[in-house]
Amino acid sequence: MKFFALTTLLAATASALPTSNPAQELEARQLGRTTRDDLINGNSASCRDVIFIYARGSTETGNLGTLGPSIASNLESAFGKDGVWIQGVGGAYRATLGDNALPRGTSSAAIREMLGLFQQANTKCPDATLIAGGYSQGAALAAASIEDLDSAIRDKIAGTVLFGYTKNLQNRGRIPNYPADRTKVFCNTGDLVCTGSLIVAAPHLAYGPDARGPAPEFLIEKVRAVRGSA
């Protein structure tokens, strides 16, 4: 009954408000592809020094959604297109609204999908520095998958950025089993999902400025702390 009520609430919210900001969608298209599969399509002979794995928000297009392309663009500017792979979470992660109401804020299949990408990155490119991110349901997904990772792989994730973190209250602004100083949570004032609700208000759709500046800056800083400034 509780799951049905929450799913109904999410559906009603979706009908009342857009699930993304049209300006952010336009910017994402202008920056380039909203789908990136560099890790999946790459091979071990062409590994990059940095691999960014990102989970989009509910109902967003591609596998990077509205915020991912901005972060990707900044990372490529910092490290060069030959220095970083960009990988969105697709496959079994459907980014459907109803999955927000599940206990971990997303589906078990989605968590396995993102776990598999981290594991693939570790196997294919064991010397790469990993960074991660997610928005809304994707933030919950990133947190859950990092929490569940083998510690040896989790230790390779230099930094993670979360926007509109739907498990922010429950996880006390952190990712369980992961260092707080490697985590940057962006929660706008008035974003109700950050305070334990699944109601989407306007501030939840306004993380574009963070994705263009503070978030990639945080990730770049964390990578350089590991690999140096080169």
From Swiss-Prot:
Subcellular location: Secreted
UniProt xrefs under InterPro entries: AB_hydrolase_fold (IPR029058), Cutinase/axe (IPR000675), CUTINASE_1 (IPR043580), CUTINASE_2 (IPR043579), Cutinase_monf (IPR011150)
Temperature dependence comment: Optimum temperature is below 30 degrees Celsius. Optimum temperature is 30-40 degrees Celsius.
Result when mutating S58A: Severely decreases activity on p-nitrophenyl butyrate
Recorded consequence of changing N100 to A/L/D/W: Severely decreases activity on p-nitrophenyl butyrate
Application of this enzyme or protein: May have promising applications in chemical and textile industries as it is capable of hydrolyzing a variety of substrates including soluble esters and insoluble triglycerides. Can hydrolyze and thus modulate the surface properties of synthetic fibers such as the plastic poly(ethylene terephthalate) (PET), or the textile fibers polyamide 6,6, polyester and acrylic.
Activity's dependence on pH: Optimum pH is 8.
Cellular component terms (Gene Ontology): extracellular region
Catalytic EC class: hydrolase
Modified residues (N-D-glucuronoyl glycine): G32
Catalytic residues (UniProt): S136, D191, H204
Pfam families: Cutinase
Catalytic activity: cutin + H2O = cutin monomers
Intrachain S-S bonds: C47-C125, C187-C194
Record comment: activity regulation: Inhibited by n-undecyl phosphonate (C11Y4). Inhibited by paraoxon.
Keywords: Disulfide bond, Glycoprotein, Hydrolase, Secreted, Serine esterase, Signal, Virulence
One MF annotation (Gene Ontology) recorded for this entry: cutinase activity
Site (Transition state stabilizer): S58, Q137
GO biological process: carbohydrate catabolic process
Removed propeptide positions: 17-31
Job description of the protein: Catalyzes the hydrolysis of complex carboxylic polyesters found in the cell wall of plants. Degrades cutin, a macromolecule that forms the structure of the plant cuticle. Allows pathogenic fungi to penetrate through the cuticular barrier into the host plant during the initial stage of fungal infection.
Assigned protein family: Belongs to the cutinase family.
Name this polypeptide is given: Cutinase 1
Provenance organism: Fusarium vanettenii
